[in-house]
Design a protein with these regions (language model features):
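Signature of uroporphyrinogen-III synthase
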Residues: 1-225
């Protein structure tokens, strides 16, 4: 059986474990990063809050910030929008391709139309959503910290890296076998792989498990042994 590593914990994978079992893949699932809240204060006015992930939203709302009633919410993609809706937050802007930060940023800049946005983030944020905005149209606030927890991972045939920070943490204690197939959760992770001269087979347009399963099937990784 082929082994597949994904830098997410099993609790976050829904039925992906069953999918791997049905397709004769031995799953190794482990996030190599942890997160902790950071105290923050909101010091300026804003018209919109943009969440690049549900994690940013969770840490933001955990501190119960005072938000004016007319403030709109925006997010990077459908999965984040779905999770925001579960906590009662309606997204007025939803990125059409969460795995393509450049497109999300361009579309968001057009939608924003001169309004001011607040961007909650981690210490390792690349601020991709803001790249097409003038600094006068946004404020940033760190709401959580990302920490590496390196761990030795058995050699696998397939590696799925869900973020640049998980990739960085993985490489502290591991090397990628020569003929391994690499899948990146979006362009930010691909750029990190490119910078290390690591070839990437697939970049997910949308960073979802549904898209991952679809790409695994499409690329014939799941050939029966």
């Amino acid at each position: 059986m082929k082994r597949i590593f994904i830098s997410k914990n099993e609790d976050d994978l829904g039925d992906f474990g069953q999918f791997c079992e049905e397709n004769k893949l031995t799953l190794i699932a482990k996030s190599l990063i942890t997160f902790e809240a950071v105290d923050f204060k909101l010091t300026s006015e804003f018209d919109c809050v943009f969440f690049s992930s549900i994690r940013a939203a969770t840490f933001f709302f955990e501190k119960k910030p005072v938000i004016p009633k007319n403030v709109l919410f925006a997010c990077s993609g459908k999965e984040t929008a779905r999770k925001l809706s579960e906590i009662g937050i309606t997204s007025s802007f939803i990125g059409s391709e969460s795995g393509n930060p450049e497109k999300v940023s361009l579309d968001f800049a057009k939608w924003l139309e001169g309004r001011k946005v607040l961007f909650p983030h981690s210490n390792l944020s690349k601020f991709s959503a803001l790249q097409n905005l003038s600094p006068s149209y946004y404020d940033t606030v760190q709401v959580y910290q990302t920490n590496s927890i390196p761990s030795a991972i058995p050699n696998c045939e397939v590696y799925v890296f869900t973020s640049p920070s998980n990739l960085f943490s993985f490489l502290i204690k591991n090397k990628i076998p020569k003929n391994a197939l690499i899948i990146a959760y979006g362009q930010s992770t691909k750029k990190q792989l490119d910078s290390l001269n690591i070839a990437c087979l697939v970049v997910l347009k949308n960073a979802t498990l549904y898209d991952l399963k679809k790409e695994l099937s499409r690329c014939f990784i799941l050939r029966k042994e």
